[in-house]
């Protein structure tokens, strides 16, 4: 198995044929898998662009594999190094795990994320290992069970009699009784999710330790029904204070099962991908961390708020719904609208517009008008070409007393919550 690690937007060189070479044939296989992935677009161009002698990774991160090769794509995060050396890969992988944990409620501390990132495995194998260890730990306290209603025709009454069935279907079988009863069983939707995850991950894991753990878990779950992933009943999973320890595992299983897997009749996976568009991940991560920053302040965060439309037609029907990334409310009153952008903003000396897209400005003006919000913000990741993180520009919106603020946050350190809280206090007096 040929493996490569590359940063988003960087190039992956295609080698001449030889031992350990990433050849044109392997590149074509990867492109085919990319084209089949949900996030890949029609021809996989949202994951890789083909430049004949090299592939260029796009703005997605994670792992993609085809028969004979795999590629790990890591984000570019200023201050953590690059994917070209092991130290940089370790730092970036740890931060990516932390971002995924925050975005998908995986109940993982920053320290644990750093420790996981230090493992010399791809992000996929790290997450598989985490799933196996946590599932084993949880099983030490027993597999979750629940009473499930059953129906059976028995020689003696168990539970209550199904009168209708007894006097219709069993009318000429008096030796049998139509019973309806509840039975305590482990074959419930939650365990079926774990069974499906174990089977799927066993198809794609290449790390010997993970393969061993998955085989052991498969034996433990041998009596659980194998339900197709598309038929898993997520809505039927009930978690309360008696079984809350399974919440993080359920969310981790959901994360791992969202990948695109192409399997053969032999059970192995000739192609698979577990990929995250960085624009989406950055948006969810900032929303979750802002929720944490504003806890106890009387302010609330709504991600992907959908309550407003741009236009109303003559019949009174609303048209063209807007969906800002983040809206901060005090009660029912919006005090700030934030859109996140996973791109490098320019220094004002280099570019007076700082590389801010014109369409983004129009969009923020629309949000300001529709929400009646005096402050709107475009938020970017910080990089070394800027003086410091925080506010980088403030603009008066013509025709009203509203302002558009551009700002950055430093993702390389542990103080993001404090950065966000300080930035909101600085930008908008409504936060005080």
Which residue ranges define each predicted feature?
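Catalytic core segments in nucleotide and nucleic-acid processing enzymes
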Residues: 1-35, 269-432
